[in-house]
Amino acid sequence: MGQGGSRTGEVAEYIRDGLDYTQWLRNFKEGLSVSTNPRQMRLDYTITMPGLLELKNMFNLSQELDTEVLTKVMFTFSNDEIMSPLSLPKDLLHTIIDEALVYMEPRATKKQRALMDVIKNLKTRETFTPTSKGKKRQLYLDKIRKQDITKILSKDKRVLDWWTSI
């Protein structure tokens, strides 16, 4: 795995506190080596706001492992749900998706179809204005978990600037 894989690991470990991405990837590859049906081993990707920055890396991982990537979007019940990709301003969300699609569309196989369909559909969904309450809640959770979301978001200055402005 190149740098993209380690970056995916960083975000995965942030989202799934306690996950050891290197061990998970080793286990996944071992599972692939003994699976007898492609439906036995598939990547499961829930797009969160920080996970949105991993679209290309998840696409690459799916291709590298030659496995399907099942894709869904984080549920959003209120505008306090700052971890939802729908908390981003619509223009920024669409730009990030469009940049990913330019990269992915010429390379995609049927194994990335769900990923492509979900992110295209994401552009049709309503976004919302996140609250400072939602940001404070996330910062509180970061403190408990001894994490820092800004380290993840700093991978894309546009997203970090948005986060800082809340």
List each model region and its residues.
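Acidic-enriched, low-complexity/disordered segments with a strong bias for Aspartate over Glutamate
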Residues: 17-20, 44, 66, 80, ...
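Radical SAM/AdoMet-radical enzyme domain recognition
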Residues: 1-76, 80-83, 92-93
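Radical SAM enzyme core and accessory elements
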Residues: 105-166
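Short flexible/disordered coil segments
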Residues: 7-9, 65-73, 100-117
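Weak global preference for isoleucine
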Residues: 15, 47, 73, 82, ...
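PAPS-dependent sulfotransferase catalytic core
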Residues: 79-106
